[in-house]
Amino acid sequence: MLDGHERTLLAAQGYSELSMYDDAIAELDTLPAEAVKHATVIELRAVILMQAKRWKSALTAARALCRTEPEKTSGFIHTAFCLHELGRTAEARDVLIAGPEALHIEPTFHYNLACYECALGNLALARLHLDKSFQLDKKFRDFARSDPDLAALRE
């Protein structure tokens, strides 16, 4: 379904890396309808919109990814992140918890849940998820040192 469209996808990624988000989206918009519905394209659109901090549009794309590939964990992580950025943190937490079982072995799942629980005032639960993210991937310890969403755990 994406055969012959690799150049367009690479161009969109390139524009995105240069922070030329409108151009990146414009590239994706040149794809035919059947390609636009492909999970790879939907996810790329969501990521570009997230980089551009266009949270409502990114949320729409991320939710489409969840519908298109309900077992793909990144759709749920992206959806939850957008909801959190829109100030809908409890909903973000609920989306992650309701996602596919495969999420539970991903450090990003636990790290983001820690951020959401911290924002919601559930510090003990936040600490549990944060520690689990560290167990799964030590690099999250570095992220946590400066993440404003986790400030309450550092106090």
Where are these regions (language model features)?
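Alpha-helical segment of the N-proximal tetratricopeptide repeat
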Residues: 3-34, 44-51
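"A position-specific structural signal for the A-helix of alpha-solenoid helical repeats
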Residues: 10, 44, 78, 112, ...
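Register position in tetratricopeptide repeats
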Residues: 17-18, 51, 85, 119, ...
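A conserved position within tetratricopeptide repeats
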Residues: 32-33, 63-67, 100-101, 134, ...
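Alpha-helical adaptor scaffolds
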Residues: 40-108, 116
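TPR/TPR-like (Sel1-like) alpha-helical repeat modules
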Residues: 118-119, 123-142
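Terminal, low-structured helical/coil segments at or just beyond the last alpha-helical repeat
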Residues: 139-155
